[in-house]
Amino acid sequence: MTEELKNKKNNKNYYSQNKNKTKAEFQKPHVKKNQYLKLKTKLDTALLEVQNLKDLNETLKKDIESERQLNLAEISNLTKKYNQKEIEIQKYGASKLARDLIQPLEILKKVVNAPNNNEVVQAYVKGFEMIVSQINNVLESHHIKAMNVKVGDMFNPHLHDANEAVESDEYKTNQIVGVLSDGYMIHDKVLIYAIVKVAK
């Protein structure tokens, strides 16, 4: 059989075989194209959603990192404040106790410095002097020191409390003419102001 005859015969067979096929079966390539387009649209939509989720994920990561940095900064600030408060407590924690001790100490100093010719009393005064010295040493070990204000010093409102202003020919205006009680410092702060009389 020749090639031509075979082709004709095959074509006849094709037509005879396809006579019985329905219209829907002939539309399969078209249906497949529609399905492909639908699937492609779904895939594109899914890819877009994935990209949106990736973008959202990046945004959330940045937000979390920013929040973490803020929290670290806040923790650092709180730690600094806490450390500063702790230093202040260590430096100035003894202030209240020192104030309570200094008032009787000043009275004891006045007793020690009062003139006395009685030998028995002088023996007690020597004992009081030792006590005053020991208390001063304890105070100094906690960085609490007397100002040692003297008559003739200039009045300083940051260190002294003027109890009285008196007329004086001997002293200049604002010069201290009398010390009623000495002042005390704790580190760099005034613990107790010196109470003084000043010339006007």
From Swiss-Prot:
According to UniProt, the name of this protein is Protein GrpE
Assembly, in brief, is: Homodimer.
Keywords from UniProt, A to Z, are:
Chaperone, Cytoplasm, Stress response
Question: Which Pfam families does this UniProt record tie to the protein?
Answer: GrpE
Q: What function does this protein fulfil?
A: Participates actively in the response to hyperosmotic and heat shock by preventing the aggregation of stress-denatured proteins, in association with DnaK and GrpE. It is the nucleotide exchange factor for DnaK and may function as a thermosensor. Unfolded proteins bind initially to DnaJ; upon interaction with the DnaJ-bound protein, DnaK hydrolyzes its bound ATP, resulting in the formation of a stable complex. GrpE releases ADP from DnaK; ATP binding to DnaK triggers the release of the substrate protein, thus completing the reaction cycle.
Please give an example of a GO cellular component term from this record.
Answer: cytoplasm
Q: Which GO terms describe its molecular function?
A: adenyl-nucleotide exchange factor activity; protein homodimerization activity; protein-folding chaperone binding; unfolded protein binding
- Region of interest (Disordered), residue spans: 1-26
Q: Which GO terms describe its biological process?
A: protein folding
Give compartment(s). Cytoplasm
Q: Which cysteine residues pair off into disulfide bonds?
A: none
User: Does this entry carry the keyword Chaperone?
Assistant: yes
**Does the keyword Disulfide bond belong to this entry?**
no
Q: Please state the protein's primary subcellular location.
A: cytoplasm
Would you identify the family this protein belongs to, as annotated? Answer: Belongs to the GrpE family.
InterPro entries named in the record: GrpE (IPR000740), GrpE_coiled_coil (IPR013805), GrpE_head (IPR009012)
